[in-house]
């Protein structure tokens, strides 16, 4: 799954277009490297998002999943 879609489905960012813009601005790092919106997310990846005043760091637990709010939280674990 592309990182822009993953961020939307996991409810880390509300809209895919916003996730795309954040990635294009270089504010999404995966395993310490800036990535484009088309990056394919893999289980175990560490994603750092600098969005607004609060940076978020999460580890991917599931790279695929339904777009349902009740299971979105199970797709990642917050590191920082």
Which functions belong to the PLM regions below?
Residues 1-43:
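A basic, amphipathic helix-loop patch mediating RNA/tRNA/ribosome contacts
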Residues 1-5, 34-36, 40-80:
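Ferredoxin-like alpha/beta domains used as RNA- or RNAP-binding modules
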């Amino acid at each position: 799954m592309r990182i822009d879609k993953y961020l939307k489905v996991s409810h880390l960012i509300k809209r895919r277009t916003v996730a795309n813009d954040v990635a294009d601005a270089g504010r999404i790092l995966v395993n310490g490297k800036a990535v484009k919106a088309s990056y394919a997310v893999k289980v175990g990846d560490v994603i750092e998002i600098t969005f607004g005043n609060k940076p978020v760091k999460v580890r991917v637990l599931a790279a695929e999943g339904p777009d349902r709010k009740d299971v979105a939280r199970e797709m990642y674990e917050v590191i920082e």
